[in-house]
């Protein structure tokens, strides 16, 4: 794959190149010249042609956030990158370059047409995010394994595929294999696939296809199950009670507790642990279920608040629109009367009256906005009190339940200590009938050693409980603070935007009157 431009000096995709390309593609008539003078914003560009420019590396395209079509063919690009922000891209041409690996396309979720024709690609992969892909051109590359075709089965919208010029295209079963494994394909190597060919291909590869479909169905079920688990986990995280609907917290207490695991082999401890775990898990489930209920209440409170704010803003806007409509009807009538009036004193008087009407409208609109600000401030403050109270109550009750977990741990610790001391006494007297594992027996050298071991286990358990409680409290407090802060900031921004809109409209109306020339009126 020699490139005529390989001998030329590589070019950098800098602002100068991009501005030149945008300018060349823009309209050339008077409108185009005006656009060039004023400057074209990259974010407004929908199509960009950068072919035959000896580009080695894709760069500086982050400002083209609304780009739909990008042409980068016939360059010397070796690596796909720099396309992360082009999420609206629909059409991408990277043909006739030096690309060896498909990569850097994970954010192009809207891409429908991709050309990688005439590169150095040997494997088809890393296209999973391109769920809308309809056209894929990979001809004249180095793909030599037919199993690459199986990878393309995941693209349900794929209808056009080009693979001619690859080693696999020389295989005797090339066309039949592709037609069998990609039954929804319409065009292969720029030729339409007829129904007869599809039927022959399906019959020839039926056994392999059936086996593959079975594996795909199993994989799909697993993916759906995993997706459902993740969605459920996110729901639990939103309620701040993830992993409390079972023995996770209890198990985590013993995961790093080597002494506690040794002590579990003491006579009578197994039954003690089982009873302890059952009671502990019940409390965790109580926290979990309570958390979900409280999350639903918080959601209802937030939804109700949002609805109230929306209704208040809508009603206020409708009042403003009515006042503006009444003003404009009167204003247009006044302007018409001014143009028909021939007496200068009367004209001056009428203009002053119009100006007074503009001032009155300004006062009315600002009064409406002030009323809305006061109304929303009261609503926001009430919501803030409610949500803070709800969060406070939730924390209080969770802490109470966590205290019950600590009580269970303290009780278990006391019982375990009793059994340990009793076992030590039996060992000293030689009355212990049961055999103990060597690592456990090593703890019973003296009373201090066994007391320290039981105490260390107890400390680990309490730390795990404390950490889970602290995590829950910290996260829900942070959530509450961020939510309230955002609501206040959003209201400030809304108010500023509305005041700006009112001022701009009033300034326009007043400027229209100020620029009214008597000579034009008299004419």
From Swiss-Prot:
Coiled coil found in the keyword field: yes
GO cellular component labels: cytoplasm; cytoskeleton; sperm flagellum
Cited InterPro entries: Cilia_flagella_integrity (IPR050576), Leu-rich_rpt (IPR001611), LRR_dom_sf (IPR032675)
Gene3D superfamilies from the UniProt entry: Ribonuclease Inhibitor
Domain LRRCT: 166-206
Coiled coil: 358-391
Location, primary (coarse class): cytoplasm
Family matches, as SMART domains: LRR_SD22
LRR repeat residues: 44-65, 66-87, 88-109, 110-131, 132-153
A Pfam entry, by short name: LRR_9
Residue ranges crossing the lipid bilayer per the database entry: none
Localization annotation: Cytoplasm, Cytoskeleton, Cilium axoneme; Cell projection, Cilium; Cytoplasm, Cytoskeleton, Flagellum axoneme; Cell projection, Cilium, Flagellum
Alphabetical list of PROSITE patterns matching this protein: LRR
Assigned keywords, A-Z: Cell projection, Cilium, Coiled coil, Cytoplasm, Cytoskeleton, Flagellum, Leucine-rich repeat, Repeat
Disulfide bonds: none
Function: Component of the nexin-dynein regulatory complex (N-DRC) a key regulator of ciliary/flagellar motility which maintains the alignment and integrity of the distal axoneme and regulates microtubule sliding in motile axonemes.
Complex and partners: Component of the nexin-dynein regulatory complex (N-DRC). Interacts with DRC1. Interacts with TCTE1/DRC5. Interacts with DRC7.
PANTHER family tied to this protein: DYNEIN REGULATORY COMPLEX SUBUNIT 3 (PTHR45973:SF12), PROTEIN PHOSPHATASE 1 REGULATORY SUBUNIT SDS22-RELATED (PTHR45973)
Family: Belongs to the DRC3 family.
Record's protein name: Dynein regulatory complex subunit 3
Protein source organism: Macaca fascicularis
């Amino acid at each position: 794959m020699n490139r005529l431009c390989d001998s030329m000096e590589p070019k950098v995709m800098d602002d100068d190149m991009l501005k030149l390309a945008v300018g060349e593609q823009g309209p050339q008539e008077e409108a185009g010249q005006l656009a060039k003078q004023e400057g074209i914003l990259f974010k407004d560009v929908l199509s960009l042609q950068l072919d035959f420019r000896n580009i080695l590396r894709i760069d500086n395209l982050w400002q083209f956030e609304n780009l739909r079509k990008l042409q980068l063919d016939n360059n010397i690009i070796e690596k796909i990158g720099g396309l992360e922000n082009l999420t609206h891209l629909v059409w991408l041409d990277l043909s006739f370059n030096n690309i060896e690996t498909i990569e850097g396309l994970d954010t192009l979720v809207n891409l429908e047409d991709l050309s990688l024709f005439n590169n150095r690609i040997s494997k088809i992969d890393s296209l999973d995010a391109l769920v809308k892909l309809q056209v894929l051109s990979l001809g004249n590359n180095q793909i030599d394994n037919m199993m690459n075709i199986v990878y393309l089965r995941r693209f349900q919208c794929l209808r056009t595929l080009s693979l001619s010029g690859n080693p696999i295209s020389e295989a005797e079963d090339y066309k039949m294999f592709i037609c069998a494994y990609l039954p929804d394909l319409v065009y292969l190597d720029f030729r339409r696939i007829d129904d007869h060919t599809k039927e022959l291909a399906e019959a020839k590869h039926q056994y392999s296809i059936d086996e593959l479909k079975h594996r795909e169905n199993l994989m799909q079920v697993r993916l759906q199950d995993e997706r459902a688990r993740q969605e459920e986990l996110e729901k639990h995280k939103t309620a701040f009670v993830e992993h409390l609907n079972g023995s996770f917290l209890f198990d985590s207490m013993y995961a790093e507790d080597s002494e506690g695991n040794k002590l579990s082999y003491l006579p009578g401890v197994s039954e003690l642990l089982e009873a302890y775990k059952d009671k502990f898990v019940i409390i965790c489930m109580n926290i979990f279920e309570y958390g979900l209920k409280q999350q639903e209440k918080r959601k209802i409170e937030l939804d109700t608040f949002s609805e109230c704010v929306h209704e208040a803003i809508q009603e206020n806007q409708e009042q403003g629109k009515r006042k503006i409509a009444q003003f404009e009807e009167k204003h247009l009538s006044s302007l018409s009367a001014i143009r028909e009036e021939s007496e200068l004193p009367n004209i001056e008087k009428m203009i002053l009256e119009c100006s007074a009407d503009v001032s009155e409208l300004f006062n009315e609109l600002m009064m409406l906005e002030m009323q809305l600000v006061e109304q929303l401030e009261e609503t926001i403050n009430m919501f803030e009190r409610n949500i803070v109270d709800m969060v406070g109550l939730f924390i209080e009750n969770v802490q109470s339940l966590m205290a019950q977990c600590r009580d269970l741990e303290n009780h278990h610790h006391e019982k375990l200590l009793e059994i340990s001391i009793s076992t030590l006494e039996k060992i000293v007297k030689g009355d212990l009938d049961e055999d103990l594992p060597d690592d456990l027996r090593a703890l019973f050298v003296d009373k201090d050693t066994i007391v320290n071991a039981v105490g260390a286990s107890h400390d680990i358990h309490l730390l795990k409980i404390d950490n889970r409680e602290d995590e829950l409290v910290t996260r829900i407090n942070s959530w509450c603070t961020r939510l309230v802060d955002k609501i206040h900031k959003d209201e400030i921004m809304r108010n500023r935007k509305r005041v700006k809109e009112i001022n701009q409209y009033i300034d326009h109306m007043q400027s229209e009157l100020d620029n009214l020339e008597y000579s034009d009126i008299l004419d």
